[in-house]
UniProtKB/Swiss-Prot annotation:
The lineage of its organism: Bacteria, Pseudomonadati, Pseudomonadota, Gammaproteobacteria, Enterobacterales. The gene is glyA2. Its cofactor is pyridoxal 5'-phosphate. Homodimer. Belongs to the SHMT family. This is Serine hydroxymethyltransferase 2. It comes from Pectobacterium atrosepticum (strain SCRI 1043 / ATCC BAA-672) (Erwinia carotovora subsp. atroseptica). PANTHER family: SERINE HYDROXYMETHYLTRANSFERASE. It holds the Pfam family SHMT. It is found in: Cytoplasm. GO terms for molecular function: glycine hydroxymethyltransferase activity; pyridoxal phosphate binding. InterPro entries: PyrdxlP-dep_Trfase, PyrdxlP-dep_Trfase_major, PyrdxlP-dep_Trfase_small, Ser_HO-MeTrfase, Ser_HO-MeTrfase-like, Ser_HO-MeTrfase_PLP_BS, SHMT-like_dom. The modification N6-(pyridoxal phosphate)lysine is found at K230. (6S)-5,6,7,8-tetrahydrofolate binds at L121, G125, H126, L127, S356, P357, F358.
């Protein structure tokens, strides 16, 4: 029997202290990492439910354990709601994360050694789209596509030329740092010309897609993967979607998830996905996603007015990429200086970046989290100005940077107190 008289603070004060400090950080710092957001209290609460105790290997109606009748309800709701949310006829809600969903697609639809075409990580792609450090780059012949060096936009003509030359088995859409709409129809046409499977990883824009604020890759894509956090604002997890494909195709995807790469699904997380999908089906979610884009565009406008370069010259979604390659400091320097001012961003490579991924010449910023806490265009314009103040100070030298950093930190804390996350 568990001793329920002890609080976490009494039982494990070190861990309790870390949680309290993280809560304070989230409340008093501005979160501009494009892949982060704040889950709702309901999403967090259900992950603390008794569903965490239940093993449920297998799928609905075909479990390897008994006693699954109630967790089946949660998984069924998650599947049904995902289908409505993304207008599809297949949904697998079991992947533990987006990377696991992506691994399942590779396992289901390709063989090791196949040629796969994905967006270059240094130009906005993702590790799991073929980076040499990832399983996808180790076990497949990866052919990258990228951006036009002048416009910062995807060069679809060059993509088609490369595809016709290399004949990939699979073409990957999706990104981790691209601020414009992708032309899914054009990419499907390219895939069809070479007989390739067209897979879209929409992890960054799933919430925008659900709200109709970003083009839905279905039905152009044969298969779509996503995380369930980021713009979707659910728990940390993954999902696989498809529409109009054969039952055999769906069976391959299911088998790749279980038993292919996973054992028991995380039923408490699947239940939280169901809650998040229900939240995303409400009208308020569409209003939120529109504001996410409006806020990103407002920040881009101010940053450009202050003389900073943005890759692709703007944004159509929730993120923007600032090119600092002409500055006397690095992306890593900028990240650290902003963090000291309580503005959390992340260093990021830019096209043709001469620096390593650990240093970089860019900053990626996004507006999902600040929009969740209630920031509008006015607040985001202020925030963009403060961000530029810090970058200006970084270029001016340590003494001026210290003065600017302290002022901006006070302004950030005051703004955050006006728009609390949970308190």
């Amino acid at each position: 029997m568990y001793d329920t008289s002890l609080t976490l603070t009494e039982f494990d004060p070190e861990l309790a202290d870390a949680i309290l400090h993280e809560e304070d950080r989230q409340e008093t710092h501005v979160e501009l990492i494009a892949s982060e957001n704040y889950a709702s209290p309901l999403v967090m609460a259900i992950q603390n439910s008794v569903f965490t105790n239940k093993y449920a290997e297998g799928y609905l109606g075909k479990r390897y354990y008994s006693g699954c009748e109630y967790v089946d309800v949660a998984e069924r709701l998650a599947i049904e709601r995902a289908k409505v949310l993304f207008d599809c006829d297949y949904a697998n809600v079991q992947p533990h994360a987006g990377a696991q969903a992506n691994a399942a697609v590779f396992l289901a639809l390709t063989n090791p050694g196949d040629t796969v075409m994905g967006m270059n990580l240094a130009q906005g792609g993702h590790l799991t789209h073929g980076n040499p450090s990832n399983f996808s780059g180790r076990h497949y012949k990866i052919v990258p596509y990228g951006l036009d060096s002048e416009t910062g936009l995807i060069d679809y003509d060059e993509m088609e030329r490369i595809a016709l030359e290399t004949r990939p088995k699979m073409l990957i859409g999706g990104f981790s740092a691209y601020s414009r709409h992708k032309d899914w129809a054009r990419m499907r046409t390219i895939a069809d010309k070479v007989g390739a499977i067209f897979w879209v990883d929409m992890a960054h824009v799933a919430g925008l897609v659900a709200a109709g604020e970003y083009p839905n890759p279905l039905p152009q894509a044969h298969v779509v993967t996503s995380t369930t956090h980021k713009t979707l604002r659910g728990p940390r997890g993954g999902i696989i979607l498809a529409k109009g494909q054969s039952e055999d195709f769906y069976k391959k995807l299911n088998a790749a998830v279980f038993p292919g790469i996973q054992g028991g699904p995380l039923m408490h997380v699947i239940a939280a996905k169901a809650v998040a999908f229900k939240e995303a089906l409400r009208p308020e979610f569409t209003v939120y996603q529109r504001q996410v884009v409006a806020n990103a565009r407002a920040m881009a406008r101010i940053i450009q007015q202050r003389g900073y370069k943005i890759v692709s010259d703007g944004t159509d979604n929730h993120l923007l990429l600032i090119d600092l390659s002409a500055k006397p400091y690095t992306g890593k320097d900028a990240d650290a200086a902003l963090s000291d001012a309580y503005i959390t961003t992340n260093k990021n490579s830019v096209p043709n970046d001469p620096r390593s991924p650990f240093v970089t010449s860019g900053l990626r910023i996004g507006t999902p989290a600040v929009t969740t806490r209630g920031f509008g265009v006015t607040e985001c314009e202020q925030l963009a100005g403060w961000l530029c103040d810090v970058l200006d100070g970084l270029g001016a030298g340590n003494e001026e940077l210290t003065v600017i950093r302290d002022r901006v930190r006070e302004q950030v804390v005051a703004l955050c107190h006006r728009y609390p996350v949970y308190q």
